[in-house]
């Protein structure tokens, strides 16, 4: 099952398939007490934006998946967020590594308070690798929408600049980590944070770039 799933991930998922076939993406449910369920309207709104503006054909309702489940191999893109603790068991860390090595992609959005726990747990997954900060010239910022200054700042907490990090296997980015940005907050329904339309649109455009980059690799 796992070997077959890895082959499927490696071969089938592309931007053209995201446009021409129904594709499902998922929200990661993790252990540790952190609020993995934060921003419940984020992914549905991003999906709607991408289907409208990128002409993707992503199922309107994201699935929820746990790392312990073989179902993770059914999703080319998994999103994780939250404000607090994350814990990966040894088997979950191994499953995530297999998923990423096999062609899957994980986007982690720090919703303020996730950073130290996420970095700790990723060392269980890839002890030999480091997150690499991405410059504004990276292609993920220059897909359908151009962000010449890199990751946009959506919500202000402590005056720090937003940062984007990638984790790479060979030359392929398999994980995109958005920090000090609150990107997913900008995808939420308008009345959740009452963000200006310009701010919300920036967040959705950056999210669309992530989707286009993932399916275009």
Model-predicted regions and their roles:
Residues 60-67, 84, 89-94, 159-163:
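Alpha-helical scaffolding within the catalytic cores
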Residues 21-24, 29-33, 41-45, 115-191, ...:
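An acidic, glycine-rich "communication" segment
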Residues 57-65, 108-111, 129-137:
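Surface-exposed patches in mature extracellular/periplasmic domains of secreted proteins
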Residues 18-77, 81-84, 182-183, 187-217:
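Aromatic-Pro/Gly-enriched surface loop or interdomain linker
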Residues 5-14:
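Bacterial N-terminal signal peptides
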Residues 25, 77-116:
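Short alpha-beta junction capping motif
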């Amino acid at each position: 099952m796992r070997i077959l799933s890895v082959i499927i991930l490696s071969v089938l998922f592309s931007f053209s398939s995201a446009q021409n076939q129904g594709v499902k993406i998922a929200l990661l449910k993790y252990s540790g007490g952190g609020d993995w369920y934060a921003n419940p309207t984020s992914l549905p709104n991003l999906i709607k934006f991408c289907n409208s503006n990128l002409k993707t054909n992503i199922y309107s309702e994201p699935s929820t998946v746990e790392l312990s489940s073989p179902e993770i191999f059914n999703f080319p893109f998994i999103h994780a967020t939250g404000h607090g603790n994350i814990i990966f068991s040894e088997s979950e860390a191994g499953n995530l590594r297999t998923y990423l090595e096999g062609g899957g992609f994980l986007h982690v959005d720090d919703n303020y308070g996730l950073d130290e726990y996420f970095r700790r747990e990723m060392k269980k997954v890839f002890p030999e690798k480091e997150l690499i900060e991405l410059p504004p010239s990276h292609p993920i910022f220059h897909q359908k929408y151009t962000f010449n200054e890199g990751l946009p700042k959506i919500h202000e907490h402590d005056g720090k600049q937003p940062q984007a990090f990638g984790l790479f296997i060979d030359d392929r980015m398999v994980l995109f980590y958005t920090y000090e940005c609150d990107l997913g907050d900008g995808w939420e329904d308008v009345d959740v944070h009452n963000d200006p339309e310009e701010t919300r649109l920036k967040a959705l455009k950056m999210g669309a770039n992530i989707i286009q980059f993932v399916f275009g690799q």
